[in-house]
Amino acid sequence: MSNKRIEQSEIEKYWEIFASLSNGGTHLTGAQAAPVLKNSQLRDEQLERIWDLADVDNDGNLDFEEFCVAMRLIFDLVNGEYADVPPALPDWLVPESKAHLVQANRALTGRQVQFERVEDDDDTPGLKDGFDWYMSPSDKSKYEEIYSANRDGRGDITFESLDTLYSSLEVPDTDIRSAWNLINPSAAPAISKDATLAFLHILNNRHEGYRIPRTIPPSLRASFEKNQIDYQVDNQRIASPAQKWGVTGGEETSTGRKAKFGETYMSRLGIGGKSSYRPAGTDFSGTKTTEDWEEVRLKKQLAELEAKLEKVESASAARSGGRRDTKPALVKRELEQLLDYKRRELRDLESGEGKSKIGASLKGVADEIATVKEQVDALEAHLRTREQVLEGLQQEIENEKSSR
């Protein structure tokens, strides 16, 4: 039996949304609920099916319980819990007050709940767990070069545009398509720069022997699923299955001698190293990533520093008279280097120099300046706290030395 349920914190959040939309009423019409539902960026036909599932009593409106059901279905779809809208409402999502209606409907239609099909790749031999969304600067630079060499006139990437890259990797076709579907749940014919970087990062890790993740962190998904107006009429036409789901007419990716991700491919294009290759057109690859990506990287760096400081504190607390190697100066220097890097980013953004000089809109630069300022303030406060901790530890060490 599934242990899934809607948590109390979710219910309280949904109630705030419901109350603001219903203006004190007990039900929401389609017009009232539409703005919130469409913010999910799901396709209209998916939202229609979600509405039909959530409207258990079939009155054409959603009461609060039904609204909670609809919001949870949307949340799970956006976060990759479902590949598509389920054909029937899962038992754990059926409101208790309406369970009899669902049972009666199933009895009349003869429709039974189907088991959800989960693609499990745990039986693939030799693959490792522990996929990490953090992109090192060298990896990110490599991804951006591949993106710049293959983007179209609108700055997007299609699945077919990277065929040559696929053939240079030791990654099965099924995994390549799984990665594409993961970062492109709306089955769009092309993806944006941020989504492309995430796609290449997944392929890189799979090439290195890590399993493809099943979900994308919400903060990362939001960074490449922002609502953007598409002025191209041809993009509104129905895309082929190959464009939507990364199916290339039955072709299989060939594999060869394993090399570092993208090296063979970039060598063919003349990218990287001392090559003079420059992609045609305006290069927006220098535009800084969103604060969501930066937040992930910064949190990882801070977690590593926290772990080092924790080791220092543990060694001091459990000292037994032996020689300790706490290296507080090294930890302090790493924190200072991280702060210096953020300050340089802030100066570049304010002066319009460096990477922010190309392709960044005024609004985007202002947002990034505010984000970096907040990060610098937080890091400075964090550094001051840790400096005090280090000073205390150093004082304890000196006291112990003097007492011997």
UniProtKB/Swiss-Prot annotation:
Keywords of this entry: Actin-binding, Calcium, Cell membrane, Coiled coil, Cytoplasm, Cytoskeleton, Endocytosis, Endosome, Membrane, Metal-binding, Repeat
Keyword Coiled coil: yes
SMART domains recorded: EFh, EH
GO cellular component: actin cortical patch; endosome membrane; plasma membrane
Source species, domain of life: Eukaryota
Topology relative to the membrane: Peripheral membrane protein
Localisation: Cell membrane; Endosome membrane; Cytoplasm, Cytoskeleton, Actin patch
This protein's record includes keyword Transport: no
Molecular function (Gene Ontology), one example: actin binding
GO biological process, one term: actin filament organization
Annotated InterPro entries: EF-hand-dom_pair, EF_Hand_1_Ca_BS, EF_hand_dom, EH_dom, End3
Main localisation: membrane
Pfam families (alphabetical): EH, End3
Coiled-coil boundaries: 290-403
Residue ranges occupied by any EF-hand domain in the UniProt entry: 42-77
Residues in the signal sequence: none
Domain EH: 10-100, 139-227
Binding site for Ca(2+): D55, D57, D59, N61, E66
Function text: Component of the PAN1 actin cytoskeleton-regulatory complex required for the internalization of endosomes during actin-coupled endocytosis. The complex links the site of endocytosis to the cell membrane-associated actin cytoskeleton. Mediates uptake of external molecules and vacuolar degradation of plasma membrane proteins. Plays a role in the proper organization of the cell membrane-associated actin cytoskeleton and promotes its destabilization.
Stated family: Belongs to the END3 family.
Subunit structure: Component of the PAN1 actin cytoskeleton-regulatory complex.
Listed name of the protein: Actin cytoskeleton-regulatory complex protein end3
Gene: end3
